[in-house]
Amino acid sequence: RLCEGLPFTTSAVLTCVAYINGAYQGVHHLRERIDELELARLHGVPPRRITILEDRSELYRGDSADIRRFNRLMGRTERWDGLDPAWLDTLEAQLDVSGFLTYMASQMILGNMDWPKQNVKYWRYTGPPRPEAPLDGRWRFIMGDSDLGFGANAGPDADLFATVRDAGVPVSRLFLAMMRSPELRKRFVDAGLGLLDGPLSPERCMAVLDGMAAQMAPEMDRHTARWRKPADRAQWEREVQLMRDYAQRRAVHARRQLNAYTWRR
């Protein structure tokens, strides 16, 4: 929910109580499945015109020729000195650069420890390019599973910038190559600072977190009795408090890391 409305693909979510044949199954988060069928439905195009790659440039759905297309883009960007404006124009024509930089900054700020070596998906429309986004044929990234973020596996001072630097996977390789460009470095830092002052500010993070916790709280006695995960309501409340601590303290560390360029080689 924190990333809804940002310039990359997200999946809608609904917190609900589930029953199967009348038996109580507890609190679940019903999430929109982002695949070629859903992207096609959202944008009014045939599913066969959608390619989705994941993780290490592996085909999830669509045309396998797009693996080579993406790898060429990554390889040529890695050979770029970061200064030639001609390649920046080419990069902009093949990748939604602003969306990608915002996606990278969001993942790092949210502290997603189950990324970038997995839970990475990116897609493009393969039909005749249209002038309007997102059907212009450019690669766009999808915010995937992030349940190991927001303090789940690391504190608010976690250096996700260093994690990206050391990951050695396509998404991090492309990002690091782009960071050779002074212009793109500035755009990335500006995107991150903009997130910290707006959509991912401590105030908004706290508001969204407290709203979701308030929605779930009436069910947590029954939910924990059913699953024992968390063990009981008190354990759930402690875990929510860890997330509150992350929401309140992450911005200070992320801002320092952005300004210090700790993600650079």
Positions of the model-derived regions?
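Short, small/polar residue-rich loop motifs at catalytic or cofactor-binding pockets
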Residues: 11-12
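Zn2+-dependent metallopeptidase catalytic core
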Residues: 1-8
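ATP/NTP phosphate-donor binding region
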Residues: 35
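Extracellular cysteine-rich, disulfide-bonded domains and loops characteristic of secreted proteins
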Residues: 51-53
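Middle-to-C-terminal accessory/interaction subdomains
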Residues: 5, 16-19, 23-24, 28, ...
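Catalytic cores of eukaryotic secretory-pathway lumenal/extracellular enzymes that build
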Residues: 41-48
